[in-house]
């Protein structure tokens, strides 16, 4: 329990008077509030909640304790340490081991503030030894747990995160055993800090939700739950700081795992409560965290918005993002948050806020603000005591300076250090060409950056912080690579890898393996480079469960931090002098791994858990004959790998086309395809060029192998194009007229088997009337032909259930799916595929079902196992316009739903033509059920050809707009 100090002192004075009249001295107990501790976790301002210690003393030592406390709270740590030392010596002279231990714990805490890690370690070790020999009373156990809390902070501060986690777990066990709920919650929050440092973000999120007593599913928290939590703790003074801290920690974790909107909601509540309670330190830390989240929202929006004007900071908004904010507004709001955090008297928060603000200013090229801020940062870093966090702050400054050089001189070679790759996003976000007004003296030399990193490395050596040392060594390698001293660059990089091999840190290892691969390419050591890239790719595979651990201290982007590793590896393997069957198969595996990693990044989760089968085996056994075409886009060319049926060797083709040329062609083609007024000739004008790039090189091999089904593993913008529309000018045929077509997100299939062997049982649902969802800013037009569409399917699949309009409720659909095993789930309703999973949805009458909820909807009620859905059909969906990653949403739906095959539309189509196409498709499926030689892919092909061959001039269904958008994903059999 907590006791007010004013009441406590009076009670102790009374006890002291009585003790002087006693025949034997008695041990007296004093509760002293330990102080809010700052955890130095890179670029995330975390706090360990207030700790209490118990001290027992007579009048004079009591005065020393009060004096030490006042010195500590006013930041006079040197003097406070001296007083705590005297207090400990006084207790030792009295033989009062319990209070001596408490004084030593406080001494350790104070020495940590001074960066005197050896002395702090000695003090806490002595304290724990003294506590071990005391009688195991509840009081002793409480003191021991609190001392362990202080030891955990010390361990975390010097980079011993795993040990700190174990220490705090021990403390939590004690608090639980003695029934101290509040302290138990505090220790859970502390554990979450260590978990974040270790990259265990999902575990951290789970323990924080548990500590805040929030029920959750898949780490989602509702607004109602947050409101209930706020009301529950409202006005509870003892728990106020704990609640603020817990919410902030939770908000930080939610941001890292990809739930930025929820993160903002929770962090805003944390800031609100800190203001309410007058907690200035937690308020500053809350603004810092909120700035990080608003920046993350801006970065997400920047990936899908075209920024045509320079980003300028012209106003001073509050730092709360809103749904309709532009990228520029979000960045300004993030800057406003950082400015609020800069007001903190806490040196750690102040420094981190300045560093993240600098990063944002560099990304948006705010030269005058950079000129003002940059000189302040190093002086601020000089105020930090040496610690794990201070080391990472120096490294972060180095990264910012690297990005500053890159922004001033954006020429970045593919063989530059990956450190420059981290800055790639800034050059696409900004078009600020108003002139570089940055003072030349503020543009750092590489040698100056090397000095900063060397300082960080030396400090890491002093602390014996191997993780920070490995990080710093790798950075030194990258800096020397840019200087041009390749031998030194390789030496430092290999030293970093040697050091990291002694402990489990794949998020560090892969970066330096990647860097080593680039260095060896510079030296034309091709085999050595392949070995390094192979190691990097294997390390990334081990990180599948949590790719966000890769770079939590610097804004993480999959495009800049992960995807280039795979692309460069394939580039290396497929160079003319390297191309052989071993390399071709390795390149194909790398393409598949990239596809899988992109989906993991999309969900911020390793979402594919089913046991996959090699497509090769399916291809070789498939009837009719099928082939698989793998694509990967590289800066100067398009690489194609072809797997033909019955052939062990892979075919390899290279098409010389730059990324810019490919993007221009595909972007124009997408625009024309989405315009129903476009004539077929206008589409063919562009799609024949795409055909020549993708299909023509392999055309003769496909003919010779009598291929009837073509399976695509597509890369980048190619995923946004329906392959059916590619046009062969020689034969004057679309690709769909030659082959049945299917897309797969890699070598993964979910237990493929022919539909002909399955008894069809359909769940049919749709929405035909106009519906509005104001909270989601969505208005859906009516789909008057949906009843006709569902009616046609009912005739073909008599064993069915139907939910239409007001009967198509989320709960009703879930109930039906839980109580029956359907082989087909057909949803004729609005939906959208978006690069943001939170904006990828399927509409029911009363809900927008988000993609992350879809798999829960498609699970049986009792076993919670995926239903064996053979086919999921989404017949009225669309892809977000201009969003290059949007079709990941389609692949994500296919994977997340657990369906063997998914049929969906890439853009909204006239629902009358859709009704016609779906009728034809199901007619073919029913025939397939009686004829084993008709696959789902062939059924779709025949349905599309039915529209393509329709010559009704009034309907114009022969135009690609009507028949082309439907794509089959997954199992084509």
Residue ranges and their predicted role:
Residues 58-59, 78, 98, 142, ...:
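Residue signature of alpha-solenoid helical repeat architecture, marking inter-repeat boundaries
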Residues 201, 205, 209, 213-225, ...:
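Alpha-helical solenoid repeat scaffolds used for protein-protein interaction
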């Amino acid at each position: 329990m907590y006791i007010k100090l004013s009441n406590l002192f009076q009670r102790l004075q009374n006890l002291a008077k009585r003790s002087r009249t006693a025949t034997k001295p008695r041990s007296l107990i004093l509760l002293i509030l330990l102080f809010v501790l700052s955890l130095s976790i890179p670029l995330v301002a975390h706090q360990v909640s207030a700790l209490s210690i118990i001290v027992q003393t007579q009048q004079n030592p009591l005065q020393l304790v009060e004096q030490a406390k006042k010195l500590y709270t006013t930041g006079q740590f040197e003097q406070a340490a001296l007083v705590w030392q005297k207090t400990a010596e006084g207790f030792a002279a009295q033989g009062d081991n319990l209070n001596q231990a408490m004084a030593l714990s406080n001494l350790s805490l104070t020495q940590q503030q001074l960066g005197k890690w050896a002395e702090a370690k000695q003090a806490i070790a002595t304290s724990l030894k003294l506590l071990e020999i005391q009688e195991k009373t509840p009081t002793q156990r409480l003191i021991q747990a609190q001392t362990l809390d202080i030891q955990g902070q010390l361990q975390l501060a010097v980079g011993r995160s795993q040990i700190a986690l174990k220490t705090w777990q021990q403390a939590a066990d004690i608090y639980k055993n003695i029934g101290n709920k509040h302290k138990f919650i505090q220790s859970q929050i502390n554990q979450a800090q260590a978990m974040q440092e270790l990259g265990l973000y999902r575990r951290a999120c789970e323990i924080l939700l548990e500590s805040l007593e929030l029920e959750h599913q898949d780490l989602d928290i509702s607004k109602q739950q947050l409101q209930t939590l706020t009301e529950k703790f409202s006005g509870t003074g003892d728990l106020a700081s704990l609640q603020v801290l817990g919410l902030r920690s939770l908000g930080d974790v939610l941001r890292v795992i990809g739930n930025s909107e929820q993160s903002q909601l929770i962090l805003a509540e944390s800031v609100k409560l800190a203001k309410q309670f007058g907690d200035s330190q937690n308020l500053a830390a809350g603004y810092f965290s909120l700035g990080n989240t608003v920046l993350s929202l801006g970065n997400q929006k920047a990936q899908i918005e075209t920024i045509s004007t320079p980003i300028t900071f012209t106003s001073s908004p509050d730092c709360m993002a809103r749904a309709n904010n532009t990228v520029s507004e979000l960045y300004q709001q993030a800057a406003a948050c950082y400015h609020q955090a800069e007001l903190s008297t806490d040196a750690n928060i102040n420094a981190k806020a300045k560093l993240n603000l600098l990063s944002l200013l560099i990304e948006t090229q705010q030269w005058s603000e950079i000129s003002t801020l940059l000189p302040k940062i190093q002086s601020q870093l000089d105020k930090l005591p040496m610690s794990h966090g201070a080391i990472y702050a120096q490294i972060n400054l180095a990264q910012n300076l690297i990005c500053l050089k890159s922004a001033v001189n954006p020429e970045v070679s593919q063989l530059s250090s990956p450190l420059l790759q981290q800055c790639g996003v800034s050059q696409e976000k900004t078009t600020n060409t108003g002139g570089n007004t940055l003072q030349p003296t503020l543009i750092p030399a590489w040698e100056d950056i090397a000095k900063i990193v060397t300082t960080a490395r030396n400090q890491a050596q002093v602390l014996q912080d191997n993780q920070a040392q490995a990080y710093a060594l790798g950075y030194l390698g990258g800096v020397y690579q840019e200087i041009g001293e390749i031998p030194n660059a390789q030496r430092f990089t290999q030293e970093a890898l040697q050091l990291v091999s002694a402990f489990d840190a794949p998020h560090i290892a892969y970066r330096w393996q990647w860097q080593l691969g680039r260095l060896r390419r510079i030296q034309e050591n091709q085999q050595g480079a392949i070995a390094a890239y192979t190691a990097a790719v294997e390390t990334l595979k081990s990180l599948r469960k949590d790719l966000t651990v890769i770079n939590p201290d610097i804004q993480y982007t999959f495009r800049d931090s992960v995807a280039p590793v795979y692309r460069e590896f394939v580039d290396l393997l497929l160079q003319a002098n390297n191309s052989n069957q071993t390399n071709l198969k390795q390149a194909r595996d790398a393409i598949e791994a990239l596809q899988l990693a992109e989906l993991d990044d999309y969900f911020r989760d390793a979402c594919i858990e089913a046991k996959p089968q090699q497509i090769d085996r399916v291809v070789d056994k498939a009837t009719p004959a099928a082939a698989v075409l793998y694509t990967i886009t590289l800066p100067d060319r398009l690489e194609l790998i072809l797997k033909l049926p019955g052939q062990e060797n892979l075919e390899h083709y290279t098409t010389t086309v730059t990324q810019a040329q490919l993007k221009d062609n595909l972007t124009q083609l997408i625009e024309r395809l989405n315009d129903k007024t476009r004539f077929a000739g206008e589409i063919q004008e562009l799609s024949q060029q795409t055909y020549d790039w993708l299909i023509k090189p392999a055309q003769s091999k496909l003919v010779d192998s009598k291929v009837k089904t073509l399976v695509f593993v597509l890369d980048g913008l190619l995923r946004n194009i329906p392959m059916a529309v590619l046009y062969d000018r020689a034969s004057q045929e679309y690709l769909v007229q030659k082959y049945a077509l299917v897309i797969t997100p890699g070598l993964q299939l979910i237990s493929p088997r022919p539909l002909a062997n399955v008894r069809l049982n359909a769940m049919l649902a749709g929405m035909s009337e106009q519906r509005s969802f104001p909270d989601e800013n969505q208005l859906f037009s009516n789909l008057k032909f949906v009843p006709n569409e569902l009616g046609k399917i009912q005739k073909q699949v008599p064993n069915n259930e139907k939910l239409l309009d007001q009967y198509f409720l989320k709960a009703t659909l879930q109930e039906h799916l839980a109580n029956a095993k359907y082989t087909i789930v057909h949803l004729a309703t609005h939906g959208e595929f978006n690069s943001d999973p939170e904006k990828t949805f399927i509409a029911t009458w009363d809900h927008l079902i988000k993609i992350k909820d879809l798999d829960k909807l498609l699970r049986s009620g009792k076993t919670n196992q995926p239903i064996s859905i053979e086919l999921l059909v989404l017949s009225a969906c669309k892809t977000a316009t201009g969003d290059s990653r949007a079709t990941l949403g389609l692949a994500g739906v296919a994977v997340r739903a657990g369906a063997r095959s998914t049929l969906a539309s890439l853009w909204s189509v006239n629902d009358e033509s859709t009704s016609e196409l779906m009728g034809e498709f199901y007619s073919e499926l029913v025939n397939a059920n009686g004829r084993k030689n008709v696959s789902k892919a062939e059924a779709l092909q025949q349905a599309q050809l039915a529209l393509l061959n329709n010559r009704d001039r009034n309907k114009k269904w022969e135009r690609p707009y009507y028949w082309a958008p439907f794509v089959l994903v997954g199992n084509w059999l």
